[in-house]
């Protein structure tokens, strides 16, 4: 599923596009924060039928957003001991997938980086006593370039990427989100790029939509935690204790695709709005 966690400019016309969710204006913050499932490797760009609903959603979403001055992506596909930001002025492409047709390795997303903003955001993180560093060599991985190629194909917005923390401690990722709260007053789009269901053996690679009660149970739990009537303290504790959720380890044998939710929720400090709840590769996501 996809969540809008904070926004001040989305229009109600989103309903006319038949996307599920409710969008409300929030004059307090300029930042926009979204968590979404980014799909299976390069398959959305290759036109895979199992991603059709996602492709339609992702290509339509920017029309509902104010164009940001900067995009910060927390990608499930990057883990470091320290919170690490890309530091290159023009990050290269990092094709962190294998076994796909040759065209998957010709995908290009030539968006500029922003070294000055990387340094500034690293300083915000470090101020909260979280070790941080810049990586001037690493490129954009597919957690960034696949969704953004659908959303902003002109690649004309500076993009930064922030790593997860090795060890995958949920509390540490909520704290990482807390460290970014000063960004809420800026015209920045913060994206948590993961997958709310990520069991590679359970995906329907033949694009069949079969009922899966375990998948449904976890998705319903996660939607309630992120959008339901809970205090922020309760919400964060649920996310810390996510392994207690129904079918948690079935849906996430390893939690790297879930943890961008924790970062986004830590930044926003408020309930989210559900904006997509459909099937990707046969699973509710």
Residue ranges and their predicted role:
Residues 123, 127, 158, 168, ...:
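Surface-exposed, charge/polar-rich loops and edge strands
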Residues 118-174, 179:
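Internal, conserved structured core segments that host functional sites
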Residues 32-37, 70-76, 162, 183-196, ...:
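Beta-strand elements within well-structured catalytic alpha/beta cores of enzymes
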Residues 8-9:
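Cysteine-centered motifs
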């Amino acid at each position: 599923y996809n969540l809008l966690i904070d926004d001040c400019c989305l229009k109600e016309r989103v309903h006319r596009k038949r996307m599920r969710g409710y969008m409300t204006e929030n004059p307090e913050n300029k930042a926009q924060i979204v968590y979404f499932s980014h799909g299976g490797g390069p398959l959305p760009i290759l036109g895979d039928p199992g991603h059709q609903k996602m492709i339609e959603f992702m290509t339509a979403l920017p029309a509902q957003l104010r164009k940001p001055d900067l995009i910060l992506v927390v990608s499930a596909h990057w883990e470091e001991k320290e919170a690490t930001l890309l530091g290159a002025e023009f990050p290269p492409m990092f094709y962190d997938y294998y076994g796909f047709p040759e065209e998957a390795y010709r995908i290009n997303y030539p968006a500029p980086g922003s070294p000055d903003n990387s340094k500034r955001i690293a300083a915000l993180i470090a101020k909260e006593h979280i070790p941080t560093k810049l990586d001037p060599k690493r490129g954009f991985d597919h957690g960034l370039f696949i969704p953004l190629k659908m959303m902003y194909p002109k690649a004309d917005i500076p993009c930064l990427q922030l790593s997860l923390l090795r060890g995958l401690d949920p509390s540490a990722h909520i704290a990482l989100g807390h460290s970014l709260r000063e960004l809420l007053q800026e015209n920045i789009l913060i994206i948590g790029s993961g997958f709310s269901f990520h069991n590679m053996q359970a995906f329907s690679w033949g694009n069949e939509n079969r009922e899966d009660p375990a998948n449904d149970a976890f998705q319903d739990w996660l939607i309630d935690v992120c959008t339901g009537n809970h205090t922020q303290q309760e919400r964060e504790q649920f996310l810390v204790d996510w392994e207690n959720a129904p079918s948690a380890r079935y849906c996430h044998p390893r939690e790297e695709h879930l943890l961008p939710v924790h970062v986004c929720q830590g930044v926003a400090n408020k309930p989210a709005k559900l904006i997509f709840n459909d099937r990707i590769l046969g699973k509710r996501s």
